[in-house]
């Protein structure tokens, strides 16, 4: 028995137990902090006094060093303050210092309109970033039309990127109101004004409003005229109607700005854009672009199941937030089994059938173009041949129409459309007649697969690749499954061939193909992936926000149209249901394109992004 130990009648085993357990005091940290605060308030064991505005705040060095990089450096790298009983903090206020120290000990920060800037100043000086973050959060909630410029100045002084970004968002969301106020016109810097005028998020009724705001700002002070070109280059002059450019904008710019400002060139550029209507898709610059960061999933035309409607002229897009399909400007004419392509931010609709009987006799050669900037359809040059059940590709600065059929039967011809000349030209044709095929673009190459001709028999497995630079078609490894009326698209490094249908070689009865396979152009290899949930012959297809969308379609086995939208997640290799189309429909087309935001979308208030500021 060891001396001083408690005597027992039974000798102690070598180990009382073989198990080991850890016990934790849940309130340990808060209790220690509470006791330290009690000691501080009673003046016990405090080894430093902080001085600001000739007023004193006692504290413990170890707690200050733990909570603040500023104090940690001061007390550990040999500075003289490490040995001083009192440390004067130049640049800190007593109001701010007391609030910050109270927070370090108690974990609560009281902020109001009277102390917020003092607390922010002190917390930034002492590098207590949690307090800085709370200050930014408070100020974000209190931003108003009365104080936003002062808060923007605070954000600049203390390099508060989070607060600065939030105030920028506030100004963008209220630009139509704020930009004409004296405070804004007098105090907003040229750099900030250019940020707002170049933003796709700026709130406005029309582009002319932004021009008026810019001209108002430029004419406030004579020295600002030197920055006229730098400011006005952010105005999207081509989005202003030509008549307004000539009769309102040009006179205003000429009267308000000196000729030396050299800004008339922007107007001349815009007029040239309007004068070359067909060539606009290949005349795109930052000033012709819509002010939006959001691309929409669109569905156009098709053959509907309701007999009274037959063909559709609807153009609608999916509003993901409301999970509803919203109507855009309708097609100039009802169409089904047409093709859609996007070039230069314009939507092109080519060919298709103008009758419910789409066997080829009702094929069209018309090409319509939709401008989302002015929400108008126009007719441009027609294809050389009428086409239905074909594929239309958009590549570089041209469209490529491939195969299909018309009143003369299946086609092998291929033609390209040049917006610059508004004309179609034949290029190398397909090696065989083909219709009911599908296609996609991958790295400037056109790929088509499957399809049929007028010969009796099953559909094809073929995969063809077209290089527009050499005008040559080449065979690639065929699909594992023959199919027609299917869909193709490119996502990541793969090309997907999706669903469709085929004819039974013995009975010649049509059956649905649900299988999906992915092609690797690098390996020239096909791989099976998750099959569709539902049949999809003659459906629309598009890739939107990293997922494949299959819209509507037809089931040959069930003889039924579909309103189902199927969505493929490549990472999970899984199909799921999306938002149903308004009607059951087949023979429609889908695409993804930026659209002019609706008025209610322009006025929605944005939210600032949260991130830690570190005074950088």
Curated annotation (Swiss-Prot):
Span list, region Disordered: 597-616
Top-rank taxon: Eukaryota
Entry keyword Thylakoid: no
UniProt repeat feature Kelch, residue ranges: 296-345, 346-397, 398-444, 446-493, 494-546, 547-595
BP-aspect Gene Ontology terms: protein ubiquitination
Classification via InterPro entries: BACK, BTB-kelch_protein, BTB/POZ_dom, Kelch-typ_b-propeller, Kelch_1, SKP1/BTB/POZ_sf
Record's compositionally biased regions (Basic residues): 604-616
BTB domain sequence ranges: 46-113
Keywords: Kelch repeat, Repeat, Ubl conjugation pathway
Pfam families named in the record: BACK, BTB, Kelch_1, Kelch_KLHDC2_KLHL20_DRC7
PROSITE patterns linked to this entry: BTB (PS50097)
A GO term, aspect molecular function: cullin family protein binding
Annotated pathway: Protein modification; protein ubiquitination
Stretches assigned to the BACK domain: 148-250
Described function: Probable substrate-specific adapter of an E3 ubiquitin-protein ligase complex which mediates the ubiquitination and subsequent proteasomal degradation of target proteins.
Description of how the protein assembles with itself and partners: Interacts with CUL3.
Name by which UniProt lists this protein: Kelch-like protein 36
Originating organism: Homo sapiens (Human)
Lineage of producing organism: Eukaryota, Metazoa, Chordata, Craniata, Vertebrata
Gene name of this polypeptide: KLHL36
């Amino acid at each position: 028995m060891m001396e001083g130990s408690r005597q027992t009648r039974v000798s102690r085993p070598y180990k009382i137990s073989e198990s080991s357990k850890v016990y934790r005091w849940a309130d340990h940290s808060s209790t220690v902090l509470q006791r330290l605060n009690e000691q501080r308030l009673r003046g016990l064991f405090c080894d430093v006094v902080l001085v600001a505005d000739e007023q004193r705040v006692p504290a413990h060095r170890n707690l200050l060093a733990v909570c603040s990089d500023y104090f940690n450096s001061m007390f550990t790298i040999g500075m003289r303050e490490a040995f001083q009983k009192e440390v004067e903090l130049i640049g800190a206020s007593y109001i701010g210092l007391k609030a910050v120290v109270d927070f370090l000990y108690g974990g609560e920060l009281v902020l109001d309109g009277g102390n917020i800037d003092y607390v922010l100043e002190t917390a930034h000086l002492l590098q207590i970033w949690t307090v800085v973050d709370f200050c930014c959060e408070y100020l974000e909630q209190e931003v108003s039309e009365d104080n936003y410029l002062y808060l923007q100045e605070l954000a600049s002084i203390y390099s508060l990127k989070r607060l600065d970004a939030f105030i920028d968002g506030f100004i963008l969301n209220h630009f139509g109101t704020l930009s004409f106020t004296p405070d804004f016109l007098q105090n907003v810097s040229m750099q900030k004004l250019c940020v707002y005028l170049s933003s796709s998020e700026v709130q406005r009724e029309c582009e002319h409003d932004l021009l008026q705001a810019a001209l108002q700002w430029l004419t406030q002070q004579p020295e600002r005229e030197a920055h006229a070109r730098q400011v006005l280059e952010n105005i999207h002059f081509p989005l202003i109607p030509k008549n307004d450019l000539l009769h309102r904008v040009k006179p205003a710019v000429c009267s308000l700005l000196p000729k030396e400002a050299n800004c008339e060139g922007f107007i001349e550029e815009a007029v040239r854009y309007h004068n070359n209507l067909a060539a606009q898709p290949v005349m795109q610059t930052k000033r012709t672009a819509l002010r939006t960061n959001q691309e929409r999933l669109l569905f156009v035309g098709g053959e509907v199941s309701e007999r009274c409607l037959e063909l559709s002229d609807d153009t609608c897009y999916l509003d993901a937030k409301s999970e509803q399909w919203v109507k855009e400007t309708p097609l100039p004419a009802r169409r089904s089994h047409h093709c859609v392509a996007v070039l230069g931010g314009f939507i092109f609709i080519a060919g298709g059938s103008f009758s419910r009987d789409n066997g080829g006799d009702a094929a069209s050669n018309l090409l319509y173009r939709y401008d989302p900037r002015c929400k108008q359809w126009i007719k441009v040059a027609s294809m050389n041949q009428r086409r239905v059940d074909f594929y239309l590709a958009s590549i570089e600065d041209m469209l490529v129409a491939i195969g299909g059929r018309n009143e003369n039967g299946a086609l092998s011809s291929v033609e390209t459309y040049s917006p610059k000349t508004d004309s179609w030209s034949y290029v190398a044709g397909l090696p065989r007649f083909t219709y009911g095929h599908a296609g996609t673009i991958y790295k400037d190459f056109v790929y088509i697969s499957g399809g049929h001709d007028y010969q009796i028999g099953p559909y094809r497995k073929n995969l063809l690749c077209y290089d527009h630079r050499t005008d040559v078609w080449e065979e690639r490894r065929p699909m594992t499954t023959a199919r027609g009326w299917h869909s193709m698209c490119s996502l990541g490094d793969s090309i997907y061939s999706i669903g469709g249908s085929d004819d039974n070689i013995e009975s010649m009865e049509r059956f649905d193909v649900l299988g999906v396979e992915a092609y690797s152009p690098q390996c020239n290899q096909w791989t099976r992936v998750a099959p569709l949930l539902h049949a999809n012959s003659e459906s629309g297809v598009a890739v939107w926000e990293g997922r494949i969308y299959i819209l509507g379609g037809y089931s040959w086995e069930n003889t039924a149209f579909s309103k189902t939208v199927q969505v493929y997640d490549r990472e999970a290799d899984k199909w799921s249901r999306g938002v149903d189309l308004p009607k059951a429909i087949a023979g429609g087309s889908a695409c993804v394109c930026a659209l002019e935001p609706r008025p209610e979308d322009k006025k929605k208030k944005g939210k600032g992004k949260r991130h830690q500021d570190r005074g950088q």
